[in-house]
Structure formats: C-alpha cells, structure tokens
UniProtKB/Swiss-Prot annotation:
This is HLA class II histocompatibility antigen, DO alpha chain. Its main location: membrane. Residues 113-205 form the Ig-like C1-type domain. The chain crosses the membrane at residues 218-240. Residues 26-217 are extracellular. Residues 26-110 are annotated as: Alpha-1. Residues 1-25 form the signal peptide. It comes from Homo sapiens.
Length: 250
C-alpha cells in the first residue's frame, strides 16, 4: 500500500534524572523518560512510550489502547494504566494546531530509512528460524513494511514492534517472519516510506555451499590413490632392504 503525503506530527517528552552526580549537573547514573509521545494526523495514530536508559520498557498505542511491554517479563514487576498514555497523546492532539502555527507551517524533512535483514540464529536447512527486518533512521514514524517470499506477500506469523526512539530523534522498528530455511525459497523485506523514491527491497536467501564438480572429485580421488600407491611401494622397498641387510653375515 503506497503512502500518501500529508502529516501533522506532535511530540512530547518528559525526562527524569536519577542520582545526579553534582548540583546542576546534566549527567546522571540513570535516566527515565515518559516519552517520546506523539500524535500524527496521518491515519490518526499515536504512541506513548516509557524508556529507561534509552531502552524502551513499554508503549501505549492509540489504536490498541493498551500497554505493550517490550518484554513480557517487564509486566511481572510493574504496572501501567494505559489511560495515562492515552491522555498524553490526547493532549498533543489538542495542541496540534498551535504547534503547526508556531512552526510557521514548515515541513519536516523526510529521512530515508536504513534496512537490514538477518536471521535470529544460525541457519540450518529444515530447522525453524526467524528472519528479522531491522528498519532504522525512520522519520516521520509512518512506514509500511512487508515480507515477500519468492515475490509473494507473506502475512502468516508476522510480528512487529512499536517505534523505538533513537538519540538523534529518529525511530527504529523491527519486523519478524518465522520461516523454515529451504534452498528454493528467497525472501525480501519491502519498505515504503516518504523518504524513499520507490519501495526499498532488502534481499535474503540461504547460501548453500556448492559441492566440487565431478572433475574435481575425480582429481581428489586420483591424488589419494596415487599417494596410497607411493606409500605402499616405499613400504615394500623398506621391508625388502631390511630383510637383505639382516641376512648379510657380519
């Protein structure tokens, strides 16, 4: 699905510094942030994020209206009412017009994303694995990511993360595809974004070692046989010489 242009985007971030080293210092042992939270007019979507030391703990998606923990284990020791995140998104939405006027209606630059595809673990034929499509350098956070197998769209088992913020105020996103490696299948991660002139395809296929040709196999066998014959002849000669020497009277 092609992306249509037209977006109003608002951001909000609240930082919390823990254990500052000295009065007025900007450095801290740890840093937590409620945000970045954003709302965008394109598709009426938004996200509220809580981070600790620049690592996302959870996010609240406007459409899902629920807190999604980056790792399920995080939800075992902490709780968060998603209404708090939704309220933050609503506040940004309510002030979008003001933000647009203050920016003098200047449009942000669409940044081309970078795409990398790699397997989760060592690939073995016939053994289930997961392909990971890492898309970073995203801005604005509006993107379409599609998996293709042999040129055909794949949706079964596909999973994705929310947008992860980066220190440079860009975003990162991960897409996952369960698959069973086969020498016949090839995969592509297709990315559509306003920073790209055309959909970007990042290719992946299993690299199967090429066996040596028949001529090479024949040469290897011939060399092995020749070495064996030479060893046999040398051994025979040594035995004969040893027998002759032992039979000579001293």
């Amino acid at each position: 699905m092609a992306l249509r242009a037209g977006l109003v985007l608002g951001f909000h971030t609240l930082m919390t510094l823990l254990s500052p080293q000295e009065a007025g210092a900007t450095k801290a042992d740890h840093m937590g942030s409620y945000g970045p939270a954003f709302y965008q007019s394109y598709g009426a979507s938004g996200q509220f994020t809580h981070e600790f030391d620049e690592e996302q703990l959870f996010s609240v998606d406007l459409k899902k209206s629920e807190a999604v923990w980056r790792l399920p284990e995080f939800g075992d020791f902490a709780r968060f009412d998603p209404q708090g995140g939704l309220a933050g998104i609503a506040a940004i939405k309510a002030h979008l017009d003001i933000l647009v006027e203050r920016s003098n209606r200047s449009r942000a630059i669409n940044v081309p994303p970078r795409v990398t595809v790699l397997p989760k673990s060592r690939v073995e034929l016939g053994q289930p694995n997961i392909l990971i499509c890492i898309v970073d350098n995203i801005f604005p956070p509006v993107i379409n990511i599609t998996w293709l197998r042999n040129g055909q769209t794949v949706t079964e088992g596909v999973a994705q993360t929310s947008f992860y913020s980066q220190p440079d105020h860009l975003f990162r996103k991960f897409h996952y595809l369960p698959f069973v490696p086969s020498a016949e299948d090839v995969y592509d991660c297709q990315v559509e974004h306003w920073g790209l002139d055309a959909p970007l395809l990042r290719h992946w296929e299993l690299q199967v070692p090429i066996p040596p040709p028949d001529a090479m196999e024949t040469l290897v066998c011939a060399l092995g046989l020749a070495i064996g014959l030479v060893g046999f002849l040398v051994g025979t000669v040594l035995i004969i010489m040893g027998t002759y020497v032992s039979s000579v009277p001293r």
